[in-house]
UniProtKB/Swiss-Prot annotation:
Subcellular location: Cytoplasm
NCBIfam families xref list: argH
A GO term, aspect molecular function: argininosuccinate lyase activity
EC number: 4.3.2.1
Catalytic activity: 2-(N(omega)-L-arginino)succinate = fumarate + L-arginine
InterPro entries: Arg_succ_lyase_C (IPR029419), Argininosuccinate_lyase (IPR009049), Fumarase/histidase_N (IPR024083), Fumarate_lyase_CS (IPR020557), Fumarate_lyase_fam (IPR000362), Fumarate_lyase_N (IPR022761), L-Aspartase-like (IPR008948)
Protein's recorded name: Argininosuccinate lyase
Keyword annotations from UniProtKB, A to Z: Amino-acid biosynthesis, Arginine biosynthesis, Cytoplasm, Lyase
Pathway(s) served: Amino-acid biosynthesis; L-arginine biosynthesis; L-arginine from L-ornithine and carbamoyl phosphate: step 3/3
């Protein structure tokens, strides 16, 4: 009986070749070829282990390792011929290895399946991506600390409901983003622990009959632990989902920060100016200077949220173990990592270059009755119940709205219309400086607390 030879590694069982459209439809090499370095890394470790347990000879191992290293050089030189008919990154590299070193190349896959191979590749790739992203978060946090220290005394309005609430320092406001990014960092560090568990050796789903020593490949590849169950090792992608969840939270924070930057650069706020290199213009309106970087980051957050939803939906209906559905895990994961990394890089470059317009910020804080709470607290210290003080100050604010005067602009006689408990010392608390300086505790907006927080932040970053 004659058997038609195919390029597929699994072609022996089939009596006809795959339909040409189906071959293109099911191929993943166009996007999973970015895993080449990690695929080769895993294969070198696997071959090294096979030689140690006697499945390969030392000469076979050396030929495989040398061949794989030459293939990596070809790929990085741009001379490697990626073939769709070979389906994926794994079979493209294996086929090229066999071309280079002959039948020995066919021995590389002994004791291994593409199921555990790809799971290993993705974990190795994601581990490196997380490390890069963590470095970008740290760089952005360093920029925030530098700007916060420089603007520790700069007063701006703090907002609730986007309405003027209380005076804060610009430095204090920036440190809020530092804190959020710190939690993003912690989540990704924690996620990395679960990413860094090795599925290699799980084979297709049940393990292998060869006398493999998974501890060897685990050590060679820098994993923290060997996966404890072969079914789980090849089939689950919860580590990718967890990464996308952490990435979504980080992008949500960047999106909120972006919204503030867009508002602050507008003619209606004018709180800050962004250098021209982070902005673009209009093809029709000559005056425009558009904050494209924060706008685009705000928009790109949706891509990462979509990746999270896509992966959850991908996994929710799959029985154990591996299913072809899992081919769809890579593009959303790749896109989420790329988007977060690039967004962080853009912000890390941009934030230190922000130029605050201090007088405009200060004037905005002065205009909105931002020290009303300070007046209420002043009356509480005079012995009045807070609810009564709240009502008294509310009447004073209404008078200020009607007369066009801020609380600090009213005379003592005007203020005493609302309470005889108000004395001349009230003006110490109605100034913007008095307001921010009074909030002198850990986490408060007082300038000395901002500087202390910056010092704590720098100590934290130095310990990473």
């Amino acid at each position: 009986m004659s058997v038609e030879k195919t390029n597929q590694s699994w072609g022996g069982r089939f009596s006809e070749p795959v339909d040409a459209f189906v071959a293109r439809f099911t191929a993943s090499v166009d996007f999973d070829k970015r895993l080449y370095r990690h695929d080769i890394m895993g294969s070198i470790a696997h071959a090294t282990m096979l030689a140690k347990v006697g499945v390969l000879s030392d000469a076979e191992r050396d030929a495989i390792v040398d061949g794989l290293q030459q293939i990596q050089a070809e790929i990085e030189a741009g001379s490697f011929d990626w073939r769709v008919d070979l389906e994926d990154v794994h079979m493209n590299i294996e086929a090229r290895l066999t071309d280079r070193i002959g039948v020995t190349g066919k021995k590389l896959h002994t004791g291994r399946s593409r199921n555990d191979q790809v799971a290993t590749d993705i974990r190795l790739w994601l581990r490196d991506e997380i490390d890069t992203i963590l470095a970008e978060i740290t760089r952005l946090q360093e920029g925030l600390l530098g700007l916060a220290e420089a603007e520790a005394d700069t007063i701006m309005p703090g907002f609730t409901h986007l309405q003027t609430a209380q005076p804060v320092t610009f430095g204090h406001h920036l440190l809020a983003w530092f804190e959020m990014l710190g939690r993003d960092y912690e989540r990704l560090v924690d996620c990395r622990k679960r990413v860094n568990r090795m599925p290699l050796g799980s084979a297709a789903l049940a393990g292998t009959t060869y006398p493999i020593q998974r501890e060897i490949t685990c050590q060679l590849l820098g994993f923290d632990a060997v996966g404890g169950n072969s079914l789980d090792g090849v089939s689950d992608r919860d580590f990718a989902i967890e990464f996308c969840a952490a990435a979504s939270l980080a992008m949500m924070h960047l999106s909120r920060f972006s919204e503030e930057l867009v508002l602050w650069t507008s003619a209606q706020f004018q709180f800050i100016d962004l250098p021209d290199r982070f902005c673009t213009g209009s093809s029709i309106m000559p005056q425009k200077k558009n904050p494209d970087v924060p706008e685009l980051v705000r928009g790109k957050s949706g891509r990462v949220f979509g990746a999270l939803t896509g992966l959850l939906t991908l996994m929710k209906g799959q029985p154990l173990a591996y299913n072809k559905d899992n081919q769809e895990d890579k593009e959303p994961l790749f896109d989420a990592a790329d988007t977060l990394r690039d967004s962080l890089r853009a912000f890390a470059d941009m934030v230190p270059a922000i130029r605050p317009r201090r007088e405009i910020m200060r004037e905005a804080a002065r205009r909105g009755f931002s020290t009303a709470t300070d007046l209420a607290d002043y009356l509480v210290r005079k012995g009045l119940p807070f609810r009564d003080c709240h009502e008294i100050v509310g009447h004073a604010v209404k008078y200020g709205v009607d007369s066009g005067k801020d609380l600090a602009e009213m005379s003592l006689d005007e203020l005493r219309r609302f309470s005889e408990q108000i004395d001349a010392d009230v003006f110490d608390v109605l100034t913007l400086e008095g307001s921010v300086n009074a909030r002198d505790h850990i986490g408060g907006t007082a300038p000395n607390q901002v500087r202390a927080a910056v010092a704590r932040g720098r100590k934290l970053l130095a310990q990473r």
